[in-house]
Design a protein with these regions (language model features):
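Short helices/loops that flank or line small-molecule/ion binding pockets
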Residues: 76-89, 103, 132, 173-188, ...
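Pocket-lining segment of extracytoplasmic ligand-binding domains
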Residues: 126, 137-236
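An extracytoplasmic/periplasmic, membrane-proximal ligand-sensing/linker region
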Residues: 32-39, 43-54, 225-289
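N-terminal secretory signal peptides that target proteins for export/translocation
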Residues: 1-7
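Short loop->beta-strand "edge-of-pocket" segments that line small-molecule binding or catalytic clefts
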Residues: 33-43, 132-149
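Extracytoplasmic small-molecule ligand-binding "clamshell" domains
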Residues: 28-95
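Bacterial N-terminal signal peptides
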Residues: 10-23
């Protein structure tokens, strides 16, 4: 056929090239997925970013899957992004109520930090020495979404019929600052953040009440938005970070930045580790569910 129609083969190749060109162009233009990661604002926005940015940069490089930090001005703002399904990965304990369970989030890890306890505390030199003295007082909290820092201590106050006014600072450091500026008479928080602030800022607290133990916040992914292969890659990077000398160095520096007492790293976890959170909602006051 080529002998009878010189140049026919070249014509076919040219037509094939033209036909395939758009597909090849689209393939080369295709960008890898970028997943948004939203950790609860445990500190002010700058310190939260200082802690997490080096960690997620490492995880992105190690996994080959791009993560991007997405945090709001307050912890409530950040959780609003999550509830609006604007993110794919979180570090949170705000998603264990029955309504939020239905959103399709799944636990894959947590920090190896000691168990957290909710606490109600006053400044070390405060004249207040018992929780009953908080009746009619103002108590600072990070925000209404904070499970250990707000829902647990406020539920305890309600159970004791101690009528106090909640003042939301937007993040835990702001609530602590209000306490030591005399704008509130007590704070609700978790034990890790009280200990960390005490070390970092050289401040003394007097703890009036402590709850039972709860696991630290959970690393979670959206089962509706992230394919299994990307979950496995990101999970492996988080959970193996402390075994890599460079990863361990990043974790050490990040822990120092926020006043953590130890080099907290990430370990495997599952939804069953957070059963105590779900139990709370079975009997919690309606205003705290």
């Amino acid at each position: 056929m080529n002998d009878r129609y010189p140049g026919f083969g070249k014509l076919v190749l040219a037509l094939l090239s033209l036909a395939l060109a758009p597909a090849l162009t689209h393939a080369s233009d295709a960008k890898p997925a970028v997943y948004r990661f939203s950790p609860v604002n445990q500190w002010d926005i700058n310190r939260t970013a200082t802690y997490w940015n080096p960690i997620i940069q490492y995880v992105s490089e190690k996994s080959g899957v791009q993560l991007q930090l997405k945090i709001g001005r307050t912890s409530a703002d950040t959780t609003a992004y999550v509830l609006a399904q604007e993110v794919e990965f979180v570090f949170s304990n705000h998603l264990f109520s029955p309504e939020r369970d239905a959103l399709g989030w799944k636990v894959f890890g947590r920090r190896n930090a000691p168990p957290l306890r909710a606490q109600i505390a006053v400044a070390g030199d405060s004249p207040i020495t018992s929780i009953e003295q908080l009746k009619g007082q103002q108590i600072g909290f990070a925000g209404p979404e904070a499970f250990i820092g707000y829902k647990l201590p406020y539920a305890h106050l309600l159970s004791r019929k101690i009528d106090a006014t909640a003042v939301f600072g937007g993040n835990q450091n702001a609530a602590f600052a209000q306490l030591f500026a005399g704008k509130v008479q007590a704070v609700g928080s978790n034990s890790m953040l009280i200990d960390g602030y005490s070390v970092k800022e050289n401040k003394k607290f007097r703890v009036l009440w402590t709850s039972e133990e709860y696991h630290d916040l959970a690393l979670m992914y959206s089962t509706k938005k992230v394919p299994e292969k990307d979950v496995k890659a990101i999970s492996a990077a988080f959970l193996g970070m402390h075994l890599d000398p460079r990863g361990a160095q990043i974790l050490h520096a990040a822990s120092n930045e926020v006043g953590l007492k130890q080099d907290a790293y990430f370990i495997p976890a599952s939804d069953s580790d957070y059963a105590s959170y779900r139990r709370f909602y079975q009997s919690a006051p309606a205003s705290l569910r």
